[in-house]
């Protein structure tokens, strides 16, 4: 079970920075709006199949992403780093995404979902450099 503090942080935000890697081993990142399904522990986002990151995910599903609170106050620094596998989303993922972003209902969507294997929350509000780590048992 993912720590409630991690879930709360993920649900409070809406943009993740996704990292993929090309067949040649070159990294790439893209910012994506996301919804989080805490029942299934999935980060859900859209990406056109023509984008570089979608093409890279189709060939190599291993991804990482970061969600951060932008602040200059050291005592308020918070962010998650996530590793996992990306896959094409299902109907439930689409419902969750549209629930979070209703305007997306009228757009042609290619839904993706990340199933995390590792999540690390750094939260300085709990103490300087305090980290909470969750790892999948799979």
Regions found by a protein language model. Name each.
Residues 53-84:
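Helix-adjacent hinge/juxtasegments
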Residues 47-51, 64-69, 92-104:
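Short acidic (Asp/Glu) patches
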Residues 1-17:
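Extreme N-terminal tail/first-helix region
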Residues 13-49, 57, 63-68:
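Short beta-strand segments
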Residues 10, 56-57, 97:
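A generic structural signal for nonpolar/aromatic side chains embedded in well-ordered alpha-helices
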Residues 23, 50, 70, 119, ...:
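Residue-level signature for short turns and capping positions that connect secondary-structure elements
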Residues 74-138:
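Charged, gly/pro-rich active-site loop segments
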